[in-house]
Amino acid sequence: ALGELKRLIPENSTISSFFLYDGTLELGLAKYNRTVVAHTNKQVVYEFWQALKLHHRYLASIIEFMFERLTIPELYLLQDNWHQYKDLEERAAFFYILSHCSDSGYASHGNLDKSRLCPVKINSLKRHKSKNFYPFWDQFEKPLDGLMTAKNTDFLLFPVGKFGYNFFEYGKNTGHDMVSIDHK
């Protein structure tokens, strides 16, 4: 997908991306000379990316320290309350650890396996560069309400990822890091 987007979106373009979560496409485009404003309406997702952007080495050291000590039962307990921790760096670290250990890719739900997060991934955070990448917290309940904040942009990007489109979406449990999309 990144290769195709690089082909379609010229260098030095400005992109407003919505539904920021794992940042794969956004960071890839930013690395290849596109300015990316990555929107999310989830405060905990924004906090992770902002913490990574501002002090990646410190955040990586917290993640490394916690990951070595946390057990699987403790991680399952954290899935329910990680977003309630007062310390921003702790929340950001839990977000990263849980989302990388989860088979769903979400911090707030999924089956957990510590082998999904290898030390190489954590070490790569220490060398993280986020030039041309700007996380933006749209403080709206609905994620697409943030479209009105996308100013002076050449392209809009909607990497919605996996989603279920069925009659049983209403009432489905979602975590503080998960976006619910109304497909009606």
Residue ranges and their predicted role:
Residues 36, 135, 178-180:
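Conserved beta-strand scaffold positions in the cores of enzyme catalytic domains, especially
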Residues 19-20, 26, 103, 161, ...:
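Aromatic-residue hotspot detector
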Residues 8-11, 56-172:
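SAM-dependent nucleic-acid methyltransferase catalytic core
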Residues 1-2, 86:
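Short charge-dense sequence patches
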Residues 41-45, 162, 183:
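Short, acidic/turn-prone active-site loops that include or flank metal/cofactor-
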Residues 2-4, 8-80:
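SAM cofactor-binding core of SAM-dependent methyltransferases
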Residues 29, 149-151, 184:
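Short, conserved loop/helix-junction motifs that constitute active-site signature segments
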Residues 168-184:
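SAM-dependent methyltransferase catalytic-core segment centered on the flexible catalytic loop
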